[in-house]
Amino acid sequence: LTDPRKTTEAQAQALLKTAKPIYYITSGIHSPENGGPEMLIELAYRLIVEETPFIQEIRNNVITIITPVIEVDGREKQVDTYYYNKTRAPGDARLPLMYWGKYVQHDNNRDGMGQFLELTKAVTRMQLQWKPTIMHDLHEAQTYLYSSTGTGPYNDALDPITISEWWMLAQNDVLEMTKRGVPGVFTYGFYDGWVPNYMFFIAHTHNAIGRFYE
């Protein structure tokens, strides 16, 4: 389906009836953000062993690929820092994560175009090999949950269909979480949707959908 040079129109139409979408979830690119890596381990476990109709539907109809930690060295340092701080006496100052990301730290998520970092190259190889339908990068910025759409102006290279799909997915997130009584889930007002150097934009340059949570 990804290469019309190898697949005829008739073959593509037949594949559409049986092929499963691939949902690729990543997290841990920013080492001080702890929630995503922890949650993805739990999610992987539930997808494997849980037998509820909800999980069975996902397991039967979607191929889910999970990379719980993109920046593995920084994650190790974050874990070490956390356990060191637990040894500090009550009232003592807690040390922040002093060094991670091989000089770039938070800007390792600004390498989607330059492709200078090994972690970016690894994600690109993943995209090229598995061709996921959606790449979903998990972050952590506040006590709320932001599902990405952007305020605009959107990047000129983005197809309007892609922007509509952003909104469709985000609105479904907000609807489903609200239906389950989860407060603080929102979209729109967090970033603009213009700068194409985020890691999830790798998906957009390979005919897929990139999105993120904060």
Listing of model-derived features with the role each one plays in the protein:
Residues T2-I29, N34-M168:
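Active-site/substrate-binding loop(s) of hydrolase catalytic cores
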Residues P4-T8, L128-I134, Y188-T205:
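Conserved alpha/beta core surface patches that mediate binding of polyanionic ligands
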Residues F54, F116, F186, F190-Y191, ...:
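Phenylalanine-focused residue identity feature
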Residues P96-L97, G112, K179-G184, I209-E214:
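Acidic/His-rich catalytic or pseudo-catalytic neighborhoods
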Residues M98, D156, P160-S164, D173, ...:
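Primarily the internal scaffold of c-type cytochrome electron-transfer domains
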Residues M135-D137, A170-G189:
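Acidic/polar loop patches that form or flank catalytic/metal-binding clefts of enzymes
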Residues Y144-T149, W194-E214:
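Active-site-adjacent mobile loop/cap segments within catalytic or ligand-binding domains
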